[in-house]
């Protein structure tokens, strides 16, 4: 996929982050030795295919300028463990659509990919966005 992705990361140095990192880097690779392990940080992809031209030359300034839903906390409920054949979705924790996660992803999609088209971003969120956290 061309472009950048925006990720939501669990708070660093928390039991959740530490447990997810251990699952990704140690526990699951030791149980599925026939599958090549990939080391990555725990994250939920909010949107992908953000053109580099939008955030060049200062990605942090672009991120700081995003108009995002006002919320101090995003909650994510695990609704299923979902195996798949796709490389980036070999084993995921499927997340629910509540707790502000979809609203955040919708705002990121509208501003990062759809040139501010909020209606298009809402349609994308309803029809295409599947919040998940990859484990393998």
Task: Indicate where each model-derived feature is located.
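Basic, often amphipathic N-terminal segments
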Residues: 1-77, 98-136
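Glycine-rich beta-strand-turn "strand-cap" elements at beta-sheet edges
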Residues: 77-87
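Short, low-order "capping/linker" segments at domain edges
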Residues: 87-97
């Amino acid at each position: 996929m061309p472009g950048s992705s925006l990720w939501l990361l669990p708070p660093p140095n928390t039991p959740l982050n530490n447990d997810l990192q251990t699952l990704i880097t140690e526990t699951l690779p030791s149980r599925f030795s026939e599958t090549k392990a990939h080391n990555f940080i725990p994250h939920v992809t909010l949107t992908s295919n953000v053109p580099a031209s939008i955030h060049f030359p200062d990605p942090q300034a672009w991120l700081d300028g995003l108009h995002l839903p006002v919320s101090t906390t995003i909650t994510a409920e695990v609704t299923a463990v979902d195996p798949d054949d796709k490389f980036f979705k070999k084993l995921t924790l499927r997340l629910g659509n509540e707790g502000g996660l979809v609203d955040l992803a919708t705002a990121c999609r509208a501003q990062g990919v759809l040139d501010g088209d909020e209606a298009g971003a809402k349609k994308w969120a309803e029809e295409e966005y599947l919040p998940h956290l990859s484990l393998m």
